[in-house]
């Protein structure tokens, strides 16, 4: 069943006209822009109270095993980082990328949520510590892991 499901997903990606190069370029650009947004968000003057609240909500989703809500809360977490970064042009560019390629239903919502919440926690801790380097690195790792997941289903 897993093999069959993987082949169906693989065919969906390939039938959409998306290439391996497109996936790599898409996620590379997201990593650069979202990494920069996380760095900006780590500035001491940035209000991250909303980001902390969204993260706590995502932890509750895990606790309650309400994984169907995770895709929305994931988007909220990322969107709040873009907003808190204070660069409207960057936010618009990242948002446009989010309207394109997505993991969608490539992995189970539960698996996706567990890994993502852990990584979001690492990003948030770096932001709270006002460590721009660590925030940027954690975000880039998070995005590139998503890229690797996508490529797993492509190949």
Residue positions per predicted region:
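Short arginine-rich
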Residues: 144-154
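Short, conserved glycine- and acidic-residue-centered signature motifs
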Residues: 5, 19, 116
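Short helix-capping and inter-helix turn/linker motifs at the boundaries of alpha-helical repeat units
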Residues: 49, 111-114
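Conserved amphipathic alpha-helical segments that form helical-bundle/coiled-coil interaction surfaces
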Residues: 26, 30, 36, 43-106, ...
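Basic, amphipathic "hinge/linker" alpha-helix immediately C-terminal to the N-terminal HTH DNA-binding motif
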Residues: 14-30
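Single conserved hydrophobic/aromatic residue that forms the stacking wall/gate
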Residues: 1-13
């Amino acid at each position: 069943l897993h093999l069959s499901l993987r082949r169906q997903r693989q065919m969906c990606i390939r039938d959409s006209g998306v290439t391996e190069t497109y996936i790599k370029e898409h996620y590379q650009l997201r990593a650069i822009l979202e990494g920069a947004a996380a760095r900006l968000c780590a500035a001491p003057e940035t209000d991250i109270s909303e980001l902390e609240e969204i993260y706590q909500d995502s932890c509750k989703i895990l606790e309650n095993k309400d994984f169907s809500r995770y895709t929305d809360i994931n988007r909220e977490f990322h969107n709040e980082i873009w907003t808190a970064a204070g660069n409207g042009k960057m936010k618009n560019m990242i948002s446009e990328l989010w309207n394109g390629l997505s993991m969608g239903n490539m992995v189970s919502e539960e698996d996706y949520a567990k890994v993502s919440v852990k990584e979001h926690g690492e990003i948030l801790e770096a932001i709270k510590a006002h460590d721009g380097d660590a925030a940027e690195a954690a975000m880039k790792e998070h995005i590139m892991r998503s890229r690797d997941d996508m490529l797993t289903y492509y190949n």
